[in-house]
Amino acid sequence: MWPDRIRTDVVAAIRAAGIEHPWEHQAAVAEHALDGESVVVATGTASGKSLAYLAPVLSALADGAEAPNGRGATALYLAPTKALAADQRRAVRELAAPLGHAVRPAVYDGDTPVEEREWVRQYANYVLTNPDMLHRAILPGHARWSSFLRALRYVVVDECHTYRGVFGSHVAQVLRRLRRLCARYGAEPVFLLASATASDPAAAASRLTGVPVTEVADDASPRGEVVFALWEPPLTDLRGEKGAPVRRTATAETADLLTDLVVQGVRTVAFVRSRRGAELISVIAQERLAEVDRSLPRRVAAYRGGYLPEERRALERALHSGELLGLAATTALELGVDVAGLDAVLITGYPGTRASLWQQAGRAGRAGQGALAVLIARDDPLDTYLVHHPEALFRRPVEATVLDPDNPYVLAPHLCAAAAETPLTEDDLALFGPAAAGLLPQLEAARLLRRRATAWHWTRRERATDLTDIRGGGGRPVQIVEAATGRLLGTVDESAAHTAVHDGAVHLHQGRTYLVRRLDLEDSVALVEEASPPFSTTARDTTAISVLETETEIPWGDARLCYGSVEVTNQVVSYLRRKLITGEVLGEAKLDLPPRTLRTRAVWWTVTEDQLDGARISPEILGGALHAAEHASIGLLPLFATCDRWDIGGVSVPLHPDTLLPTVFVYDGHPGGAGFAERAFHTARAWLTATRDAIAACECEAGCPSCIQSPKCGNGNDPLHKRGAVRLLTRLLSAAT
C-alpha cells in the first residue's frame, strides 16, 4: 500500500490509471521521500520508477496548490534528453488529470516558445527541463525564478546513471549551484533519483548531488521473458587493410533484421551509436521494404539528436500512435521514453556499458509481454570479445559510474558561474568540494573573479555560463547549412566537427545524403550539398603525448604502471572512403586541419629490455607489438570503466622521451580527465588480461578489426604485430603484483 501520508486524491488518480497497489520498491521510495530523505531507485527497466517518485511529488504539489498563492510547493524534473522530458510531461498530465489544476506540469527547454516561458516561471509547479537549461537559463536568471525556487520541495533526477564522465562531473557542479541558490531562498529540496540497475547506486547518486542518498534496489516488479541473442555478422570475401578478413557490417545486418521484423509486423527499435548509422539503417530498410510492399517504407524512420524540434516531436507522436513499425534511433530514445507495445530491440554494436545495454534491451516488452533483444556485434575487439564471452555480459554486475566533480577544468567555470549568480563566500566553498579553495587565486589571477571584502565577484560583461559546455564538447556548435538554400540542417559540437563534417565527409539527415564541401572553423559553419555517393567516410588522426606529472605508479617487475597528467596533441590528417553495406575501403584522402592540444589524465605502462627479451620481442617487431596492444586495450577498456572507446585515446612508442622506455599510453579525451584513465589504472590487471585474451582468441592470422585494427588509426594500422602483442602482454602480466 502507499504510505498514509500520500493524499487520498493522488492515490485515487493512480488507481484511475489502472494501478491498484504499488510494488514494494515504489512504496519504499515514497516513504523515504516523505521522510525528507534523498533516495535513488535503481531497479530494472519498466519497473515503475516514475510512479515511485511521482506519488510523493504529486501529493506535495496538490498540498501546495491549497496555499494562498496556489504554489506552496514546486518540483523540478531533470532529464538528460528533450525526448524524455516531453514523454514525462505527457505521462504526468495523464496521471494527474483527475487532480485538475492542482498539478501544472510544463517543459522548459530550448524548444519552449518565448511567449510560454513567463507562464512557466510564474505558474507551473512541476517544471521539466534538462541540466543544460538549468545551467544556462534557470540558475543565471534565478531572480525571475525566485517564487519557484523558494517553494522547491523535490528535485527529480531521471536516468541518473547517464551522468558520468565529464558530462556527469559538470552536472554534479550544476546541482551544487542549484542547492546553493535554493538555500539562499530558504529551500532545501529532497533529491529523488532514478537509475538503471547500477553498481553502488547510493554512492554514485551522493557523488552526483553532494548530499547523502539512500538506495532502493530490490525490484519487486514482474518481468516478461526476454530472449537475448548475440549476433556476429558473417565473414565476407573482401579483404581489408593489410589483407585482413572483413565481416559484414553491423549496420547492414541490423538493416536486414529490421526489415524482416517490420515485414512480420513486429514493432522494433534499432539502437545505433551514431547519427549517421541511424540514418543509414533507416534508408537501407526503407529500400528493402519497398521491394516487398510499397506501403511499408513510410512506417520506418530514423530518430536522433540534431533534428529540429518539430521533426523530433512528429516522430515521437508517430511512434506512440503505432503509425511507425520500425525506428532506427540513437540514444536520444534510449533513455526512459515509454514506448508501449515494442516487441523487439536491435542493438547495433555494444553501447559502451552494461548499464546502457540493459537499458536499451529493456525498451522491449514494457507492457509485461515477452520480447526479443539482439546485440549485433561490430567488427572490433570489444564486440568480438563479448559475443565469444557472453559471461562478460550476463554474469558480471553493471559498472560503477565514474565522475570527477573536482576536475579543475570542470570546477573552475562553475565557480565563476556561481559567483555571477550571487557573490561567492568562504562558507560556499565546502559545497563545491575540496579543490575549490585552491582554484580561486587562479581565477583571480586570470581576472575572472575579484575578491571584495568577504566575497568573490564575477568581473566580466559576458555570461559566465558561456565558459563551459556541460556536454563536454567545448566551443560553440558548428552549424550544418545546405549551401544551395541556406537551410540549417542541424548542428555538431566543435570538438566533433573535425571528424564528422570535415571537407569531403558524408553527412546524413532524414534519409538524405549530403557531402561536406567546406568546413569553416572560424565561422563555425559546414556547407553541404545533397549528393548520392556510394560510400561512407571515416576520419583518421595522429597523436603525440608528453608526460606533465606522474601522480602515482606501481612496479610490475621491472616495468612500471603509472597514472598522471599528460599533454596530448591530436590532428585529423585524412579520411577513408568505405563502400556502403560491405565496408570495403575505396580510398584515403588527405586533410589539412589544425592540430588541437589537450591537457588530460592518462594511464601508461613501460617495459624493460629484459622483459622484451623474455617475450621474444625483437626491435623489428617492437613497434607493431606495442601498437597492437594499445589498440586492443582501448577497445576493451569500456568493460572496466563507464566510457566509450571514442572517449579515450592512445599512443604507443618504442622509446618515449619522457620515460626513456617503450611505453603505451591510454588517455581521457577530455580536458582535465574524465576518470576513465584512473579507473583503468585501478583495474589494470583485469583490463590487460582481457585485452591479451581477446587478441589471442581471435581466429585471424595477423590481425583484423575484431582484435587489433582500429578504425581511427592515423597510421593506417601499420605497424601491427598480433603475436608479439600477446607475448608482450603475457610477460607484463606475469610480473604484475
Regions found by a protein language model. Give the residues of each.
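Short cysteine clusters
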Residues: 698, 703-707
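Extended Lys/Arg-rich polyanion-binding regions
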Residues: 370-373, 379-394, 404, 409, ...
